[in-house]
């Protein structure tokens, strides 16, 4: 009895699996990423259907990439595979009846010409890692460059200030010392001249015999001598 029920269930499942069968061209479907391919099937269920792109080796009710959801079951769909599909991967297109998901069908397995992707999560993870690395490098450059430049800018400023101060002190001190010395010398000369001029004044009382004759002018002396000769 159980064997009969199992066979009956298998037969019903086989009939259900034949719903909306694909019309495969001679030689099978040829998919590539450069031009679209038209899928054709024989509509056998009313309402709408959903098309999914599945990996042939791993098919579950929740797996696959949805190509079209709630599509009118007209028996045709144009499909252009994306280039990031896995290279040399085996794919199949699944058609599912939206009213009864147990009614589905598949195309024969195929490979996509022009696909360049790696494993399913490979390209996404790789791109995220590269972006993070570039952001870190740019941040490191922005932080390091100004820090190493600013100390070198401060050093010349300090040196210039020291040189300027030393020059100012030296220049100011030298003229001042020279002027003071010159002034002292001038003062000494003036003092000497004053002393020389005042020497006759500070002498004792003049000699009556010598001082008068020395003080008389030449004309007056001649007159005096003439008077003395007349006497």
From Swiss-Prot:
Q: What is this protein called?
A: Probable cell wall protein ARB_06477
UniProt xrefs under InterPro entries: Kre9/Knh1-like_N, SRP1/TIP1-like
How is this protein positioned relative to the membrane? Lipid-anchor; GPI-anchor
- What positions belong to coiled-coil segments? none
Compartments where located: Cell membrane; Secreted; Secreted, Cell wall
- Indicate the secretion signal residues: 1-17
Query: Which keywords label this protein?
Result: Cell membrane, Cell wall, Glycoprotein, GPI-anchor, Lipoprotein, Membrane, Secreted, Signal
Main location, first listed in the record: membrane
Q: List the disulfide bonds.
A: none
Q: Where is this region: Disordered?
A: 107-206
Q: Where is the lipid attached (GPI-anchor amidated serine)?
A: 203
Q: State what this protein does.
A: Probable component of the cell wall.
PTM description: The GPI-anchor is attached to the protein in the endoplasmic reticulum and serves to target the protein to the cell surface. There, the glucosamine-inositol phospholipid moiety is cleaved off and the GPI-modified mannoprotein is covalently attached via its lipidless GPI glycan remnant to the 1,6-beta-glucan of the outer cell wall layer.
* Similarity field: Belongs to the SRP1/TIP1 family.
Q: Specify the species.
A: Arthroderma benhamiae (strain ATCC MYA-4681 / CBS 112371) (Trichophyton mentagrophytes)
* A GO CC annotation given for this chain: extracellular region
Q: Which PANTHER family match?
A: ANCHORED PROTEIN, PUTATIVE (AFU_ORTHOLOGUE AFUA_8G04370)-RELATED, MATRIX PROTEIN, PUTATIVE (AFU_ORTHOLOGUE AFUA_8G05410)-RELATED
Compositional bias of type Low complexity: which residue ranges? 121-204
Positions annotated as pro-peptide in this chain are 204-231
